[in-house]
Design a protein with these regions (language model features):
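Basic/aromatic recognition patch in beta-strand/loop cores that engages polyanionic ligands
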Residues: 5-8, 52, 56-93, 97
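Short, charge-rich, low-complexity interaction segments located
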Residues: 39, 61-68, 102-105
């Protein structure tokens, strides 16, 4: 069709607002420090992988399966961690970043107790 235009079929990805709770920031810093003491430079790579997981959930909030009540989880690429979050209205709230070997009951307790803390 000469001179015509074709509509793009590409999907536009819209990011949802994001809140990262203090506990999640602490979890990421603590894990990054642990990795850095074992192999310099690894902390930055860990943080980039966590950031990629968070970017995914801001674009696709329902990407992670429900784990406990309102809490969902996406796995961090290349590291044995999960980002635990909830969707509150249109906002993605990251509550914690926990190692996959951690006791699921302990994670649930931490997530449930954290919901009463003020947001960062």
């Amino acid at each position: 069709m000469a001179g015509g235009s074709r509509a793009s079929s590409a999907r536009i990805s819209v990011s949802h607002p994001l809140i990262i709770r203090r506990r999640a920031e602490h979890d990421m810093a603590e894990a990054g420090l642990w990795y850095e003491t074992r192999r310099p430079g690894t902390a930055l790579y860990f943080i980039r992988c966590v950031d990629a997981a968070i970017a995914l959930i801001t674009r696709h909030p329902e990407a992670g399966p429900v784990q406990f009540g309102p809490f969902r989880r996406v796995l961090v690429s290349r590291f044995p961690f999960g980002v635990f979050y909830s969707i509150e209205a249109e906002t993605v709230v990251v509550h914690g970043i926990y190692h996959s070997s951690r006791d699921p009951d302990k994670i649930r307790q931490l997530l449930e107790s954290e919901t009463d803390e003020p947001m960062a």
